[in-house]
Amino acid sequence: MTITYTSQVANARLGSFSRLLLCWRGSIYKLLYGEFLIFLLCYYIIRFIYRLALTEEQQLMFEKLTLYCDSYIQLIPISFVLGFYVTLVVTRWWNQYENLPWPDRLMSLVSGFVEGKDEQGRLLRRTLIRYANLGNVLILRSVSTAVYKRFPSAQHLVQAGFMTPAEHKQLEKLSLPHNMFWVPWVWFANLSMKAWLGGRIRDPILLQSLLNEMNTLRTQCGHLYAYDWISIPLVYTQVVTVAVYSFFLTCLVGRQFLNPAKAYPGHELDLVVPVFTFLQFFFYVGWLKVAEQLINPFGEDDDDFETNWIVDRNLQVSLLAVDEMHQDLPRMEPDMYWNKPEPQPPYTAASAQFRRASFMGSTFNISLNKEEMEFQPNQEDEEDAHAGIIGRFLGLQSHDHHPPRANSRTKLLWPKRESLLHEGLPKNHKAAKQNVRGQEDNKAWKLKAVDAFKSAPLYQRPGYYSAPQTPLSPTPMFFPLEPSAPSKLHSVTGIDTKDKSLKTVSSGAKKSFELLSESDGALMEHPEVSQVRRKTVEFNLTDMPEIPENHLKEPLEQSPTNIHTTLKDHMDPYWALENRDEAHS
């Protein structure tokens, strides 16, 4: 009963779809012609009464009614209601088709998994697939009127060969007030387990695959049963039907052509045939008829499912697959492309025009000049290199630049990122980082960099262990002058630092300091009074004993209570040097 026109629209040509309008079976004309004739007859009866049977006063009243109906007829949301309803019906129709039980996969598993070419094996395979077909027929006769007319009772199924008399008696013993379409699937599961226990199915994995496919078909049958039971809500169908028919009942009056002599707006013409009203009836009522036909595809309409053909096809194909085709294989031979790495199937003269080369991609044929194919240096790498030069000059490591890779030995000597610029800052690193980033555009960041360099202990400064940055030589090293206010020193354990500063001793002593007097300290704290002498520290590295390898880890592993001092505003580098000297002595 399905109307197939796929071959007629295989090629989009002039008139290919227009020829479909001439079909009668399954067409909209076949569904609509009766109601359209009724609408046409009612329209011309009302027109005849208006023109010939009414008096002038009655005509005036009818004309007012016509204008009123025509002005308010558009308030009915017929397109909105019909659109949602037909979409719901078409979706439901396609889901029912997808749940039609096809035993093709199950018959392949039964033919391959259930072994034995003897009579017992053959009987086992045919019985299993017959149970599957019986379950399909039981559910189809429950939802399809065409299948029910073919098998109106269980006795007809026995006579048709879907069920044996013994199975019919077994089915009648189950006196339940429910549909019995699930019983053959239970028989199938039990018989499959018996076949596995009897050695007909070798592995439990094969049994599981067989039962999974059986459950898939059983689920599809359950879905068909649910679709037949749970329909689209009746109120929705009623609303759509009332909206469509009330719209065209109003059109019978509102779309009448009035007397042009009375000069009503929109009624300048007096046509006998309301063409667009008839077209509107054809479209909207035809739209409703589509939903009425698809709402139950298991009926006897022209476009309903061919359920009886499905029953015949499934039984014939499945029995052939599990019986005659079981282990009936053709002899294996080398194919005609046995030693050809690139097989080329031939084309006929009619299909030679469809031969195409392989598609390699839309950019495969793009050509570039030689200059355009050269790689360009990365701009970010150049900026990072420039920033690295400035950072090396200032003795800092960039926070946005990733350090080079370090091996297992140099990784321990790499200065910590947080100890360089954030030592002595609050523990809220996020606020500290935002403060540093906000002051990068100001000159103050240079002063902070110098202060951070001086505040860090010597062994944690960049270049202390790196020969390219700070060459180890016996030449004196100097520190930049303090650009800001003098630092206030706090007490350090074991040392009295009140009103005193440091002074280096260059005669005799190595790596030692002495305290300056208060006047010398005042000159150093106020460089604008007099020119301050540059302070130098001399290290004698020639007579130092050889340091073991693990000695480099000691400054990083020392407790902060032994080597760190607490300063305000800025840390004095001389105290850091002295602490380092005392810690290593």
UniProtKB/Swiss-Prot annotation:
Listed GO biological process terms: chloride transport; detection of light stimulus involved in visual perception; gamma-aminobutyric acid secretion, neurotransmission; glutamate secretion; monoatomic ion transmembrane transport; protein complex oligomerization; regulation of calcium ion transport; regulation of synaptic plasticity
Q: Which UniProt keywords apply?
A: Calcium, Cell membrane, Chloride, Chloride channel, Disease variant, Ion channel, Ion transport, Membrane, Phosphoprotein, Retinitis pigmentosa, Sensory transduction, Transmembrane, Transmembrane helix, Transport, Vision
- Identify the species of origin: Homo sapiens (Human)
Q: Does the keyword Transmembrane apply?
A: yes
The protein's gene is named BEST1
Topology feature Cytoplasmic, residues: 1-31, 83-237, 289-585
- Per UniProt, what is the membrane topology? Multi-pass membrane protein
Outcome recorded upon mutating C69A: Impairs inactivation of ligand-gated anion channel activity by sulfhydryl-reactive agents
Transport among keywords: yes
Where it mainly occurs, coarsely classed, is membrane
What is the protein's known function? Ligand-gated anion channel that allows the movement of anions across cell membranes when activated by calcium (Ca2+). Allows the movement of chloride and hydrogencarbonate. Found in a partially open conformation leading to significantly smaller chloride movement. Upon F2R/PAR-1 activation, the sequestered calcium is released into the cytosol of astrocytes, leading to the (Ca2+)-dependent release of L-glutamate into the synaptic cleft that targets the neuronal postsynaptic GRIN2A/NMDAR receptor resulting in the synaptic plasticity regulation.
The annotated region (Auto-inhibitory segment) lies at 346-379
Q: What is the effect of changing L41P?
A: In VMD2 and ARB; no effect on subcellular location in transfected MDCK.2 cells; possible decrease in protein stability; reduced chloride conductance
> Which reaction is catalysed here?
chloride(in) = chloride(out); hydrogencarbonate(in) = hydrogencarbonate(out); 4-aminobutanoate(in) = 4-aminobutanoate(out); L-glutamate(out) = L-glutamate(in)
Where can this protein be found?
A: Cell membrane; Basolateral cell membrane
Q: Which family does it belong to?
A: Belongs to the anion channel-forming bestrophin (TC 1.A.46) family. Calcium-sensitive chloride channel subfamily.
Residues crossing the lipid bilayer are: 32-51, 61-82, 238-255, 275-288
Q: What is known of its domains?
A: The C-terminal auto-inhibitory segment (AS) modulates the open/closed conformation of the channel. In a closed conformation, the C-terminal auto-inhibitory segment constricts the channel concentrically by wrapping around the channel periphery in an inter-protomer manner. To allow chloride movement, the C-terminal auto-inhibitory segment opens partially, leading to significantly smaller chloride movement.
Name of the protein in question: Bestrophin-1
- Subunit description: Interacts with YWHAG; this interaction promotes the ligand-gated L-glutamate channel activity leading to the positive regulation of NMDA glutamate receptor activity through the L-glutamate secretion.
Annotated consequence of substituting D312N:
In VMD2 and ARB; no effect on protein stability; loss of cell membrane localization in transfected MDCK.2 cells; reduced chloride conductance
